[in-house]
Amino acid sequence: MLWRDVCEIFNKIEKTTKRLEKRDYFIKLIDMVKEKGKPEDLKKICYMAIGRVYPEYDERELGIGEKLLINAVTSIGIKKDELLEKIKETGDIGLAIEQLKSKIKQASLFFQPLTVDEVYETLKRVGEIEGEGSQKKKLRLISSLFLRASPIECRYLARLILEDMRIGMNVPTILDALSVYFNVPKEKLEKIYAITNDIGLLAEKLLMGDLESEELKLKLFRPIKPMLAQLTPSIEEALLEMGRAQFETKYDGARVQIHKDGNKVKIYSRRLEDVTNALPEIVEAVKNINVDKLIVEGECVAIDKQTGKPRPFQDILRRFRRKYDIGKMMKEINLRVYLFDILYKDGVSFIDEEFEKRRKVLEEIVGYENDWRTERKRIEKELKSDKIIDISYKLVTNDAKEAREFYNWSLSIGHEGVMIKNLKAPYTPGSRVRTMYKFKPTLESLDVVITKAKRGMGKRKDWYGSFEICVRDEEGNLYPIGHVGTGLTEADLEFLKEEIDKIIIRDLGEEVEVEPKIVIEVAYEEIQKSDKYPCGYALRFPRVVRFRFDKGVNEINTIEDVERIYEIQRGRK
């Protein structure tokens, strides 16, 4: 399968803004692979389309910055000063290289055309090179690809190396294309993808006609996308919908997914990042659980042992992000994990089991229920304990008054509110479901991503003063919903200056456009209808609550979330 043929389709995908047209072009790619290539080619093309070489769950990166890429390109005859000027003009290194490559003698005519396999395997080798002289070796490999590439191939090769394809292709659109082409319900593919986090593997198995492959099943040490809750306007409304339900304390912590096989333990964040090394005390506590193979979910909370109440969320992030002096940090910040679900135990998957059964299995493993109705005194006594592994506090009821008492108690011990869970519901990975709700005392804050930064004035003249913030639609397209500048300390502004300067796409004078990589949580006075923004809404008086380093752009709030909160807000007026 020729890389050139794939790039021609990528170009068509890039030119259209219509999701269905993007899907249909990708269907043509699938058809091309079926005719000219092999299933493994489709696997690689799926990764490439979303700017990856490795599967989504795999944390490895190529680690090639723009500087090394520029050096690789200048070694094949493109002048550095011309390239830098063209990058400034286009705002896109891929387009810049394409335009300049078209002006030099086409040496690529004397070489065999690049194949998908060659491009993919070469970049994999680049990502695996380490040690002394690694930069020179990487430079040679990358240069060899650009030497043989045509101008359009150079555009997508450069973007792939920087892991940003800019064609507007995402996993949901690929899943849609696979569903249409192979005539398989999209919901089925979405579930498999959420379990594997490997769109390439899924596509390959579909082309092989092997959708029941063991490789597509739940697997230890391959984290799965978490099931997410929706917001409910009231406890009464949730009970009206569910009937008898399980209420659990909603913790202000960081969600973790824990995998255990004997003495091997891995801990993953909600973004599926491996945070094992930062949490050694949790690893040791999990090793002592008397189960051989296990996948459980929980909330990791920083605990103040003097009061038994949770410490600020930022303390948890300090632990998660720590790479050095971990022992010292362990003494400063004590952690506790409240387990709340089980997905796998000793060769048996529990994903399709009802929540009531999953909870019972989890309680058998821990050895107690933490039932607020019958064990409240013991629970309160143990708030200040050294316990590292616990199980979420629960109340099973259909009585709104009793549920409200449990909710108020959860707030009184320093937590956020309650989760409300349908006892009969299976675990639906990767979905925001209507079988699990969260209820908090105030309007839900929003997780948004920064897309522009405006240069500051006065006291903020050395930093950026305000930031354009965006939510997303279901396809991953970003929509501005306001600008925020309050709630930030000088240290925050200094941090943002450093981070934003690394991800500038285009300098627009008074402001800069940046890659959507910095996620922040914002509070606001209210959500308003607005013609100013294409999404139709604007935040009134937004303020930064905290940085969400545990979340990526795919996990920010959606326009649908904004609409739902807006309706809840109207109901409260």
UniProtKB/Swiss-Prot annotation:
Residues bound to ATP: E248, R255, R270, E299, F340, R432, K438
One GO MF term attached to the UniProt entry: DNA ligase (ATP) activity
InterPro entries found in the cross-reference section: ATP-dep_DNA_ligase, DNA_ligae_ATP-dep_bac/arc, DNA_ligase_ATP-dep, DNA_ligase_ATP-dep_C, DNA_ligase_ATP-dep_cent, DNA_ligase_ATP-dep_CS, DNA_ligase_ATP-dep_N, DNA_ligase_N_sf
A GO BP entry: DNA biosynthetic process
Pfam families cross-referenced by the UniProt entry: DNA_ligase_A_C, DNA_ligase_A_M, DNA_ligase_A_N
Record field: catalytic activity: ATP + (deoxyribonucleotide)n-3'-hydroxyl + 5'-phospho-(deoxyribonucleotide)m = (deoxyribonucleotide)n+m + AMP + diphosphate
Cofactor(s) it depends on: Mg(2+)
Entry-linked CDD domains: Adenylation_DNA_ligase_Arch_LigB, OBF_DNA_ligase_Arch_LigB
Class of the enzyme per the UniProt entry, highest EC level: ligase
Active site (UniProt): K250
Annotated PROSITE patterns: DNA_LIGASE_A1 (PS00697), DNA_LIGASE_A2 (PS00333), DNA_LIGASE_A3 (PS50160)
EC numbers on record: 6.5.1.1
Alphabetically ordered keywords of this record: ATP-binding, Cell cycle, Cell division, DNA damage, DNA recombination, DNA repair, DNA replication, Ligase, Magnesium, Metal-binding, Nucleotide-binding
Role noted for this protein: DNA ligase that seals nicks in double-stranded DNA during DNA replication, DNA recombination and DNA repair.
Family: Belongs to the ATP-dependent DNA ligase family.
Protein name: DNA ligase
Organism the protein comes from: Methanocaldococcus jannaschii (strain ATCC 43067 / DSM 2661 / JAL-1 / JCM 10045 / NBRC 100440) (Methanococcus jannaschii)
